[in-house]
Curated annotation (Swiss-Prot):
N6-acetyllysine: residues bearing it: 40
Keyword Lyase tagged: no
Protein source organism: Plasmodium falciparum (isolate K1 / Thailand)
Needed co-factor(s): Mg(2+)
Protein name as catalogued: Tubulin alpha chain
InterPro entries: Alpha_tubulin, Tub_FtsZ_C, Tubulin, Tubulin/FtsZ-like_C, Tubulin/FtsZ_2-layer-sand-dom, Tubulin/FtsZ_GTPase_sf, Tubulin_C, Tubulin_CS
A Gene Ontology cellular-component term: microtubule
Modifications after synthesis and translation: Undergoes a tyrosination/detyrosination cycle, the cyclic removal and re-addition of a C-terminal tyrosine residue by the enzymes tubulin tyrosine carboxypeptidase (TTCP) and tubulin tyrosine ligase (TTL), respectively.
Sequence positions that bind GTP: 11, 71, 144-145, 179, 206, 228
The organism's taxonomic lineage, starting at the top: Eukaryota, Sar, Alveolata, Apicomplexa, Aconoidasida
Amino acid sequence: MREVISIHVGQAGIQVGNACWELFCLEHGIQPDGQMPSDKASRANDDAFNTFFSETGAGKHVPRCVFVDLEPTVVDEVRTGTYRQLFHPEQLISGKEDAANNFARGHYTIGKEVIDVCLDRIRKLADNCTGLQGFLMFSAVGGGTGSGFGCLMLERLSVDYGKKSKLNFCCWPSPQVSTAVVEPYNSVLSTHSLLEHTDVAIMLDNEAIYDICRRNLDIERPTYTNLNRLIAQVISSLTASLRFDGALNVDVTEFQTNLVPYPRIHFMLSSYAPVVSAEKAYHEQLSVSEITNSAFEPANMMAKCDPRHGKYMACCLMYRGDVVPKDVNAAVATIKTKRTIQFVDWCPTGFKCGINYQPPTVVPGGDLAKVMRAVCMISNSTAIAEVFSRMDQKFDLMYAKRAFVHWYVGEGMEEGEFSEAREDLAALEKDYEEVGIESNEAEGEDEGYEADY
């Protein structure tokens, strides 16, 4: 088996986790108490869901995941929620006092009290796997726990499981909507760590997803539940090929191979289509080429960043439902002819496609319509540098006055770590710039070849 362990850190990570496991259970016909009704059990040959669930002797299916927060309230909601019987009680780990939006508290003082318990639990989960493929980590980079403790966790995982892939789903601070004053500090400090210790980071940002909910689902005031269910669909599409069979299945390590041209350039944009409400879906024919086009729409990107301002290096299209390779090839060919979608010229093919025959499942009573086919796109574009430069500007404004820095230093950080992290991000912006430019300089040389064709 190719198991995957999910780690949900901090409030954002746990709430996204709730939405994900709710969806996974629906997709596999697992009840909130972990039982699989007998009619489903007869499909015993279809045990691909064991990548995400482990089965106990009593026929109960337990998610291979850990929920961690430095304060108890959010984890307590899981402990008392609908799915309380699904999770092993030791997988729900909470500390006593929170990180107070402070990276240093999450990373140094409060974090180190909880980290060993977590790693011990992860070790047990890993021992329970026959062929552990890697980790999915869910956290926000703006808070204290997701950023500080999340990075501590990644650093320790790198030591213990060096060769395993780590995919990160990061809730990134939005340009306009802020939940904490010190977000820029936490984000810059944690990105410094994400650069080194994770293989692929998929950027999500609340504001972008709010806009998608408002525009496509006509929800006037989206709640976190609306947002998280949409994020869960993306994560479900990415992992569908691990949990079901399909024509072109994609492994977790394949994301890395196909999307990351250079180790540091591993921050991805994601989009999902079709995001439609039931009233609209009834009147629309959502063909493969239509959903592919809308996955490339800048407005459908789940992070506030416009891919038209950059070039694509690679992208991965994960289709599910009623889709055949012929349609996919046609849709991709159409995308390649569009002038607005530019690829760097050192990566001429640029597309990795996966097809999975399991149609998307929706949460009953949720906002999304039940559709026959859907696509999730993960793309590596130089435009993501916009997200970093926005954050760096905010960081610089505060750091120039050393505002709020004493809270971090008081928790055992050194001021040098701030400037080190900031320099690392400046280097990252430069890297993205060079990856985009490299091609222009090469263009002169290429013209000679083209003439020979």
